[in-house]
Amino acid sequence: MCLKILVRYNTRGNTYSTAWLCALGKVLPFHRWHTMVQTCTPNVTINCQDPAGGALIARCWYLHEGHQTAAFRDVLVVLNKRTN
């Protein structure tokens, strides 16, 4: 399942944006990923940094489909657009 949301992603001084945040089907061992734990605002906008570049795994609170409660998920951020 992918949610259409805005993600601002900074790596190596470049900023990327993506409209997709894909929830993984299972919980991964978080220590295996060279990432930062990210806490998201209710509108699911996040800022992430990954020194290695490319996609990353971020952990995020988000509101799903208008529900009043948030779910804690591991999410895959897929880069698809570079912005200035």
From Swiss-Prot:
Protein name in the entry: ORF8b protein
Keywords: Disulfide bond, Host cytoplasm, Host nucleus
Domain SARS ORF8 Ig-like: from-to ranges: 1-82
Transmembrane segments: none
GO annotations of cellular component type: host cell cytoplasm; host cell nucleus
Cysteines joined through disulfide linkages: C22-C40
Localisation per UniProt entry: Host cytoplasm; Host nucleus
Function: Non-structural protein which is dispensable for virus replication in cell culture.
Principal location class: host cell
Pfam families: bCoV_NS8 (PF12093)
